[in-house]
Amino acid sequence: IRLSLVGSEMCIRDRSVQTAEGALTEVHSMLQRMNELAVQAANGTNSKDTDRKAIQDEIDQLNTEIDRVAETTKFNEIYLLKGDDGTKQINLNAHDAGLKGSLTDKGDGTATFVMDELKAGDAVSIGGKNYTIAATTTDTDDLITKASAKNTDIVINGKTYKYQAAKGAGDDSSAAAAKAGYYEEGVAWAAGAGKTADGLKTLAAAGSTVEAAGKKLTSLSTAEATAGVSASNQSVITDKMAYVKAQTELLSANQIGDTVGNAAVYKAGTTAAATLADATNKFDIKVGKAEVANTLSFSLHVGADADMTNKISVDIDTMNSTFLGIKGLNVTDKNGTAATYAIDAISDAISKVSSQRSALGAVQNRLEHTIDNLDNVSENTSSAESRIRDTDMAKE
């Protein structure tokens, strides 16, 4: 009876799970603060040299403290958040760099991203900068054809060409009547000055801007099309240039926390980066990896005897910045793009901590019931033991 009593009381005293969960509560709080700072750094009104540097300083301190908590939290000389002996490589989550499209993380260290297909005149944001997709002369010719079919006014390189409707009743001899169905620059209809839709197309040569029916297209010269960008307006780029820029941002977003150097972005179906000559809207991604300590595993013995069913298994991953995918987090770039990508990385870190806390919480809830039962056993065993000790053997 004494053996059972002492064993039960020893089981009740174990607080290793509570210690680990309590430490993770603080890690969780620090990550929430880092998220606030990253959002603040992503704001375009910050100064690179002052505001963002101050924000970076606090993020660095929080990262250091997270590592310290992971390195030093222990119960009965067992380090709970440091991991176990040996190392392993883990895959980080794939990110879409805020681009519009469909991201598929396959869970095997690879992902695919299909960016929304870009067409002439589309507006797109890449890496925090806004661009307009350039047109070809085929695109501008098609716009003129569709606009003329609806008798819509057309603007070419800033000049408006108004459509002249058919003559009205009693207007047989007017110059306007003679030019019915034609386009003319301005509102005056001088004899012989009318133009057909095909005539307007000759004015919309490569390098022109055409506006009609609520749509605006800018075509590029041959040299500009080869370079992928307008010489006079750097925000006008070809669709292929947009895909190349998107590839660069995808790589930046997926390199955060990649301590192994595994992250890469390729043109879909290849192991080479897309170029201006062959870029498409489809990408293959090798996600970042981190080398971390093995998972710590131990068992809590919750019974007074040697029955192996009196075991509750506990698994705790190392909870340092490397495992969380935020090691070396940087928010000091000029336009706040790095801070924007950092928000995704911090969100992943919060999810990891939440998952570990959830697992520990489940064990702790089970332990609460186990402890209540052990309290019951201990109390009744103690009562029985006392009665036996107090028995008057002479009377018996």
Spans of model-derived segments:
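Primary detection of the long, small/polar-rich alpha-helical "axial" segments characteristic
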Residues: 2, 7-396
